[in-house]
Amino acid sequence: MRRLSLPPRPNWEERLREVGFTWYAPTPTHPVPYWGEDACYAFTPTQIEGLKRDAQDLTNMVLEATGAAIEGGRMRELGIPTFLHDAVRASWDRDDPTVYMRLDLAYDGSGHARLLEVNAQTPTSLIEAAVSQWQWLEDRLAAGEVAAGTSQWNTIHEGLSEQWAYLARERGVTQAHFSSAREVEDIATVTYLRDLAGAAGVSGSFLAADEVGTSPDQRFLLDTWTLPIRHLMWLWPFEYAWESRDAAFLSNTETRFIEPLWKAATGSKGLLAHLHERYPDSGLVLPATLTPGSLGENVVRKPLYSREGQNVTLPGQTQTAGVYGDLPVVEQAYAELPTFEAEDGPRYPVLGVWVAGDEVCGLGIREGRSRVTDNRATFAPHVILPVQ
C-alpha cells in the first residue's frame, strides 16, 4: 500500500462535473478540497484480495450481530428509543430489503483490516467512489499516466444496479420516493440512486426530507401531493427522525424505508461492542465496550450516533467539537491509522468498503489531516497495480 503523487488532469474539474460531482472545491464548512486530484493509493492484487475477504467476513458478522441485538431485545443498549423497538423488530422479521452500506476500516497494507465503524443507513461519498474515481482511472490510463493493466476494486455501480433489480424482481418494489436534506451532495447522491433504480425498473421521484408529510388518518407517509409513500429511499438519519415532532409515525407507518428500519441497529456504534462480545477472538474486530473504563485508557470514545468525527476522543486528547456530546458512548480499542506524507503534511487514510445487499463490491478512501476523519478529509482514488 503506497500513496502516489500524480499531476492533475488538465480538465479534472470539468470531468467531475460531467458525472454530477460538483462539491469538490473547499467551502467554509469543508475548508480543504474534497476531491484529491494530485494523489492516489496503490495496492497489490494480493492486498486487495485480502481486503475483500476481510470485508466480506465483517459484513457477515455485522449482519449476524444486528439480528442478535434485535432478536435478543438489546436495542436499548444501542440507543434506539423504546417506542421504536417493535417497529425495528418487525422490519427485521419481514426481512425488509437493503440496498447498501459502507464499512470503514483501518488498514496499513499488511495483516488484516480492522473495523472502525459501520455506515449502515446514510453512507455518502458514493458518487466519488462508484463513478468519479473510475472516470479518473480511465482518464489516467488513456493519458498513459498509469501502467497498462492498472485496475480498481470497483464494481459499486454494478452491485447497486443488481440490488435494485433484485428489489424490483423479487421484493415487489416498482416505485419509490427518494428523499434527502437540501444539500448538494445529498441530493446528488439520491439522484444517482434514483437513476440506478430507474434503470432496474423502479420508478422514482424526489422530495426533500422536510417535505415528507404525515396525517393521523393515513397509514403511510405522504408526498407533497398528499399521496401515499409506499417505499421511501431516505438519506436522512433515523436518529434525526426519532427526535422530530413526527417521531411517533416511525413506529406505526406502513411506509417501508430503504434503508430499512432495522438498519437503526446496524448503524449504532454500540454494535461495535456487540461485535466484540460475539467475536472476541476475531482479528478483524477491535475490542469495544458500552461500559466506559473497562478497556483501560488506550481507547477511542465515540457517541453511539455521530457524524464527521464529532465528539470523538482519542487517547490523551481532548474531545473533538460537535453536537453529539450528550449521547451515550462506546469505547473502542485504539487502532492507529497509517501515516503517509503529502507536500502540506501527513495524511491518515480510512478505507471505506461498499456493500451492495450483503456482498462487498468496491473501495473508496478518505484521507484525513488528523487521526479523526472529519470535515477536513479528502476523497482519494485508488489503483491496483498490475503484477510485474
Residue spans for each PLM region:
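Preference for protein termini
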Residues: M1-Q388
